[in-house]
Amino acid sequence: MSSPSAPLATPDVELDVHTLSSENLPWLCIVWDDPVNLMSYVTYVFQTVLGFSKKRATELMMQVHTEGKAVVSSGEKDKVEGDVKKLHTAGLWATMQQAG
């Protein structure tokens, strides 16, 4: 086994702190798989509550079903809170978190 000769140089990188600030990151609405709701109902909710086309609603429902969760909306905190509340009212398991 050879020993390292010299540390690798790292280039000088200036980070724009404002760009990386968590305040600038969008919020995500995540729907989680649950043992209660039928796939057809989840698709229906995505169409009627979030306004997705049947094709997109089906794709998101399948992502929830196969991967356990899907991001169904993103944006400002107030908007995403509203989406989570609507999904809860429809009986789906939804949470929100900040991207990043």
From Swiss-Prot:
Single biological process term from Gene Ontology: protein catabolic process
Gene3D superfamilies named among the record's database cross-references: 3.30.1390.10
Quaternary data: Binds to the N-terminal domain of the chaperone ClpA.
Family affiliation: Belongs to the ClpS family.
Gene: clpS
Entry protein name: ATP-dependent Clp protease adapter protein ClpS
Species of provenance: Corynebacterium glutamicum (strain ATCC 13032 / DSM 20300 / JCM 1318 / BCRC 11384 / CCUG 27702 / LMG 3730 / NBRC 12168 / NCIMB 10025 / NRRL B-2784 / 534)
One protein family per Pfam: ClpS
UniProt xrefs under InterPro entries: ClpS, ClpS_core, Ribosomal_bL12_C/ClpS-like
Role of this protein: Involved in the modulation of the specificity of the ClpAP-mediated ATP-dependent protein degradation.
